[in-house]
Each structure stands twice: as structure tokens, then as C-alpha cells.
Amino acid sequence: MPIFLNFSAGSILPENELNSLRYIVQQNQNDTVIIRGRHQMEIRYIESVNGFTIHPVHSNHLSILMKRGNSLARNLERQINNGRSFEQVSRDFMLQLSLNIGWQKGAENALKSKIHSHAFIVNPDEFTCSKQYLECPITFCIPENGVFVKNSMDSKVCSLYDKSAIMQLIRKHHPHPLSREKIAKEMIIDKNNCYFDIMNQHFRILDTD
């Protein structure tokens, strides 16, 4: 069903009308057409970039009418996209996406680097606890090359992990096996900052306060 809109090249639509228009277009993607007099415009919502694209539908090829239709489309497109053209919306989306990917890659590299620097050869005889407390929560075996990881971001309790197993989780973007949180470099603990709490029977982070 077409939408009839009283709109000219210099018009500024109230925000409530823009919100209504956005909603209608988002709900009717197939054949939404905006008509004012003899000008018809197709409007589409592109969910992938969260933006609207508007194109005039030219029923004739008179140059002056085509230019006016293009001007109306550009004006309305900027208003419905909060001051940006659809091209700008797409460009901003791609820029933000590349920044996010770069940030995520940097965070992942920092996490891997910290695991490498905090990993150590596990000698069960060096620990005062029973060997069962040295088993990795992923492999259920005592690791040859291990690293201490907090049980959750805010926990003071940590566990010994097999270095290769925890690295595999990170490469596959799997969550922390105990807390189900995203694994972060703040969870990686130096061996010298952990001790076995005999009373509570688990490894604990040394208080530095």
C-alpha cells in the first residue's frame, strides 16, 4: 500500500513523522512507495547497515522532473538517516566494522601473548596439593605446559589449564569453560601470584593490597 507524503525539496519532517515512516518501511519491505503529486520514490530499509535508501521512480524522462525527483530523494534520505546519505551510512558502518575487527584482533593477540609469557612447565612435585587439583578443566589431565586462569573475571580463585587447550578455545572464540564469559587477558595469572588454599582446596590469587 503506497504512503502519501506531503514533502518538498525544502521540507523538514517532524521527528514523529520520521519515526513513523521508518517503522512503516521496516515492516513493509516489498513494495513501499512514497508519493507526492507526480513524484514517486522507492524506499528500502537495509538491515545489515541499519540505514534507508531512497530512489526516485521516473515515470517520464523530462530532465527537470528527474532532477527534482533526485533532489527530493536526497533530501528525504538524509532526514530519515539522521542527517546522512545512505552512502555515508554504509561508509560509516564499514569503518566501524573495520575498527571493531582491528580492536578484537589486537585484544586476541594481547591475550595470546600473555598466555605465552605466563605458561610454565608443570612439575607436580613442586605443588603442595594433591595431583587431582592440577588437572586441567578442559582435558581433565595434568598439563605438561600449563597456565593459571581465573575461574571468572571477578573471581579470586584460579585453575591450572593446559596451555594448548586454552589456546584452542581462544582460536575458536569459545567462552570460558567455567564462567561462560569471554576469555580475556585479565584472567591470565602469573604462577608466582597463585597459591594453593589448603583450607578451601583450590588455587587462589595472592592478595596484593
Curated annotation (Swiss-Prot):
InterPro entries in UniProt: Effector_NleG, Effector_NleG_sf
Top-rank lineage group of the source organism: Bacteria
Gene deletion effect: Significant reduction in bacterial colonization in C3H/HeJ mice.
Keywords: Host cytoplasm, Secreted, Transferase, Ubl conjugation pathway, Virulence
Enzyme Commission number(s) from the entry: 2.3.2.27
Compartmental location: Secreted; Host cytoplasm
Pfam short name (any one): T3SS_NleG
A single BP term in Gene Ontology: biological process involved in symbiotic interaction
Signals that turn on the gene: Transcribed for 1.5-5 hours after treatment that induces type 3 secretion system expression.
Residue spans crossing the bilayer: none
Catalytic function, reaction form: S-ubiquitinyl-[E2 ubiquitin-conjugating enzyme]-L-cysteine + [acceptor protein]-L-lysine = [E2 ubiquitin-conjugating enzyme]-L-cysteine + N(6)-ubiquitinyl-[acceptor protein]-L-lysine
Molecular function (Gene Ontology), one example: ubiquitin-protein transferase activity
Protein modification: Two sizes of protein are detected in situ; only the smaller protein is secreted.
Family statement: Belongs to the NleG E3 ligase family.
UniProt function note: Effector proteins function to alter host cell physiology and promote bacterial survival in host tissues. This protein is probably an E3 ubiquitin-protein ligase that interferes with the host's ubiquitination pathway and targets host proteins for proteasomal degradation. Mice infected with a strain of bacteria deleted for this gene were colonized less quickly by bacteria.
Protein name per Swiss-Prot or TrEMBL: Probable E3 ubiquitin-protein ligase NleG7
Taxonomic source organism: Citrobacter rodentium
